[in-house]
Amino acid sequence: MVLPQRHRLRGRGVFDYIYQRGQRFQQGLLQLRVADAATNLLREPPETLEGELRFGVVISSKVSKRAVKRNRLRRLLHEAFLRQTFRSDLPPTWLLLNLRPGAVELSDDNLLEEWSTLIQRAGLTDS
C-alpha cells in the first residue's frame, strides 16, 4: 500500500524542523518524533489542514545494507500508519519515525507491536 501524497513528509527543511522541534519518544528499536505542522515549510500548503497527519520513515543503511530490506520495512510501517486510528482531536501533526540498527531482525509482528506501543506512548491514539 502506497502512502498518499497528502500524508508524506518531504524536503530537507521539513525533516530538519522535526529533528529540532519535535518531541521524541522511543520504544525498543523505534524512535518517533512528533511536531506540530509548520505549513510554511511545505511546497504547496493544502487548503485545509484540520486533522491532517503527515508521516515519514527514516531507515539508514546501518539498519540494513540492502535497499530491498529497508524498503520492505518502510512499506510495512506506511501500511501500519494508514490502518491506525488516531485521535480525532489532533491538531495538524507531523510524525517522523527512525529505525535503529537491529530493526531488520525483528519479526513483522514485533515491529508492529513496537509501533503501536510507541504511538500510544506519544498520546496519538484514544486507547
Swiss-Prot record:
Could you tell me the EC number(s) of this protein? Answer: 3.1.26.5
**A molecular function (GO) term:** tRNA binding
Organism's domain of life?
Answer: Bacteria
Sorted keywords for this record are: Endonuclease, Hydrolase, Nuclease, RNA-binding, tRNA processing
Gene3D superfamilies listed in its UniProt record? 3.30.230.10
Keyword Hydrolase belongs to the record: yes
Which leading EC class covers this enzyme? hydrolase
* One GO BP: tRNA 5'-leader removal
For this protein, the record's InterPro entries field holds: Ribosomal_Su5_D2-typ_SF, Ribsml_uS5_D2-typ_fold_subgr, RNase_P
Catalytic activity entry: Endonucleolytic cleavage of RNA, removing 5'-extranucleotides from tRNA precursor
Against PANTHER family, the record matches this protein to: RIBONUCLEASE P PROTEIN COMPONENT
- Assembly, per entry: Consists of a catalytic RNA component (M1 or rnpB) and a protein subunit.
Q: What does this protein do?
A: RNaseP catalyzes the removal of the 5'-leader sequence from pre-tRNA to produce the mature 5'-terminus. It can also cleave other RNA substrates such as 4.5S RNA. The protein component plays an auxiliary but essential role in vivo by binding to the 5'-leader sequence and broadening the substrate specificity of the ribozyme.
Q: Report what the protein is called.
A: Ribonuclease P protein component
Species in which this protein is naturally found: Synechococcus sp. (strain RCC307)
